Design a protein with these regions (language model features):
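Double-stranded beta-helix
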Residues: 157-231
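Transition-metal
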Residues: 1-188
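Conserved metal-binding segment of the jelly-roll/cupin
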Residues: 74-75, 227-243
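Residue-level preference for alpha-helix termini and adjacent loops
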Residues: 16, 62-65, 125, 204, ...
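Short solvent-exposed loop/turn micro-motifs enriched in small/polar/acidic residues
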Residues: 56-58, 108, 217-220, 226, ...
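A generic structural signal for well-ordered coil/turn residues at beta-strand boundaries
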Residues: 11-13, 109-111, 221, 229, ...
Length: 243
């Protein structure tokens, strides 16, 4: 795509194109290189009238091309208002933009429009409560979770799941993992089956049965979405998702 031949131990996972101050793209012509920020300052009409009227003289998006070799972490993006307040609050506390504990690196929200360049699977938002209950009740080891959800709000329920200790995670997940090991190896599990993605993620991320990740439970709570080449999906603020 970009004419580079990556070493086997250094795959190219992401290519970002945009005018974010932290790492703007560059434009190169016969006269040399220029940052996209500088180019747009000198040539704001390049943005187009409609964009300038709505967003001003800044590029209003960041284009990312991803090659997802392994499951990525679950993300949840703030609204514009939340991002602005969070950014200012961390500035007031003196948290540096380069600090690893920093949550808000800028004032912008991060809605995502994703277009599949090939066959692609992702997690997109919570299923309905009825769908979650049906999924949990279909698996004996997850029925205690269904009982929890029957007495808690989804927010309380999800917080408890994500804070579960290893013993609890083992009680929930190990029976499923053990029962599906052979069907998974034989290619007998459908890709819309959350059990498949639990086994796949453990294999891809080298997750050991004695060190389970609470995020594995999310395969039973979120919508598993399949996109074909050329199809797209929108992740608005507040929608948990993972590629």
């Amino acid at each position: 795509l970009i004419g580079l031949h990556s070493a086997k131990d250094q795959p190219c996972a992401e290519w970002w194109l945009g005018a974010h101050p932290s790492a703007p793209s560059e434009i190169e012509d016969v006269t040399g290189k220029q940052s996209l920020i500088e180019f747009l300052l000198q040539n704001p009409t390049a943005l187009g009238q409609a964009s300038r009227q709505q967003f001003g003289d800044e590029l209003p998006y960041l284009l990312k091309i991803l090659d997802v070799g392994k499951p990525l972490s679950i993300q949840l993006h703030p609204t514009k208002s939340q991002a602005e307040k969070g950014f200012e609050a961390e500035n007031a506390k003196g948290v540096a933009l380069t600090d690893s504990t920093r949550t808000y690196k800028d004032r912008n929200h991060k809605p995502e429009m994703m277009i599949a360049l090939s066959d692609f699977w992702l997690l997109h938002g919570f299923k309905t409560k009825a769908q979650i209950l049906a999924t949990l009740n279909a698996r004996p080891s997850l029925q205690p979770l269904a009982e929890k959800l029957g007495t808690q709000s989804l927010a309380e329920f999800y917080a408890n799941v994500m804070l579960a200790d290893q013993s609890t995670l083992a009680n929930w997940l190990l029976p499923i993992i053990e029962a599906n090991q052979q069907p998974y190896k034989n290619g007998e599990l459908a890709l819309d089956n959350p059990d498949y993605w639990v086994l796949y993620t453990m294999e891809a991320m080298a997750i050991l049965p004695e060190k389970l990740d609470a995020g594995l439970v999310c395969f039973y709570l979120f919508n598993i979405v399949h996109l074909k080449e050329g199809e797209g999906i929108f992740q608005d603020a507040g929608i948990p998702h993972a590629y």
